[in-house]
Amino acid sequence: MDLRFGDSRPTDEERAAVDALLGPPESSWEGADRSDADLRWARGGRAARDRRDLLLPGLHALNDRLGWISEGGLDYLCRRLTVPPSEAYGVATFYALFSVRPRPATVLHVCTDLACAAAGAPRLCEAAEARLGPESGVTVERGPCLGLCERAPAALVVRAGEDAAGATAGGGVTRAAAVSAPATPDAVVRAALTPENAPEEPPAALAVPQAPDPGLLLLGRVGTVDPADLDDYRAHGGYTALRRAFALGPAGVIREVTDSGLLGRGGAAFPTGRKWQATASQPDHPHYLVCNADESEPGTFKDRVLMEGDPYALVEAMTIAAYATGARHGYLYLRGEYPRALERMEHAIAQARARGLLGDDVLGQGFSFDIEIRRGAGAYICGEETALFNSIEGFRGEPRSKPPFPVEKGLFGKPTVANNVETLVNVLPVLTLGAQAYAAIGTGASTGPKLFCVSGSVDRPGIYELPFGATLGELLTLAGVRDGLRAVLLGGAAGGFVRPDELDIPLTFEGTREAGTTLGSGVVMAFDDTVPLPRLLLRIAEFFRDESCGQCVPCRVGTVRQEEALHRIAERTGADAAADITLLREVGRAMRDASICGLGQTAWNAVESAIDRLGAYE
């Protein structure tokens, strides 16, 4: 593909997809017919830069319409946004869900990550590839976790076409999308050939074995409330927290969140109240709120269940966070592999806006706030907050060096507070119960309830809500752990393994830290003795190799060297593997000490724990 403006022209379909998002072009500079006005003015400077953030939605519009992004389509989008084609090409090729090469309109994504691999995903792929040949009009792609681990193995079918191309910045609802989970060869082939006739997904409540249980603080409405009905949400306590927030005022809300001891639920466990206070106190304006719903850690699916089962709770929580921090505009960065969550959140935001719960005068309080959805496109690295900012702004999703920190210079260079879905939803019980009552749940250092994503060798996989302090063994017993347990992976691919004799580890940030492991985002993946550990470790190494953004040498090179070493020792043990294990340790230390962001810093964790705790390759 030529990296400059060329002679390639967009098709009528491509032009229509872009124009549906951006509106019709105003001049020949943007691709319209030439007029006398073109001799007198051209959009540039600030006006051009202010539209750069529409690049990602524009790429989605093209990819959704045709299934790939052609040179002519990319050129037209670049002219409309005044973005150099070379930069737009770099953005388009950064994301796994986009293609800049021709491919069939239907793509079958089969998860081959940890939970699905243990459930037979490799055999599923082979069967699908054998039955969906070149003449089928379907591309079969093996890929990372789809966030459907409780129903492994999982597959996602996406069909491009006019109905699939959205005309919103969020990318629109990918209507011709079908989820098959648990997937069988027959089911995925049927879904791939006729996704519009695929069976409906099961309700989100099936991913919550404890549901319906109104006593749950975070999951109590899942399975009880109609996720599409705002009135039903309000009848079950919805918007009580926002009304209390208005009564407290911004400073009072921050004080309540601080006193509750709420820590971020994304893995870093940073105090939420401190982050909000730091953002609110910044003199530079405007302030922004970003909700990170791009959960891509293998084994994680809690945010999907919350958005599918209780979407208005997230809208309310984002509104409270914006009120407290002085933000007037919020972005919900939602994972591209979550079509139903996207549909539910778009509907919830539209209904809230129509009922005066978003917009210029929320609940008549003189507070203005609105939410815009940005759909991700398959990049694990965009879970890192500064990479996510770059993605929203229309650049490659590469992490930024810190400082400056996001509370000072975040999205668009302005003070920004970024929280994930679970963290924000925890704010609701903080305000409805009060800080002291909330802090009484859990432990002194880890307060409140926590969501755990349990999958693998258990009879009842799903999302579990438990107070901090419950042990790993108690959680696995609740989930029905099977006989022959060999290891448990805590925190996903970036986490660590523990042995079956370590199930008394308390599930708190401080408890897992003292045990030499991590709680991470709440992934708890059980593996029995039928799962080959070397193959599991190799898949983790492949995952980090694929997902490294390549910006820094320690991660770019280290993840490849780690995978190469694991390939070499896959069939060796003991002394034969000693040299490569020594190399792995050296590479792992280099990645941990010198990588820019958490991806490289944690890429060695699971492999290290398997060697040291499980005796892998002995």
Regions found by a protein language model. Give the residues of each.
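Feature of Fe-S/electron-transfer and energy-metabolism proteins
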Residues: M1-E618
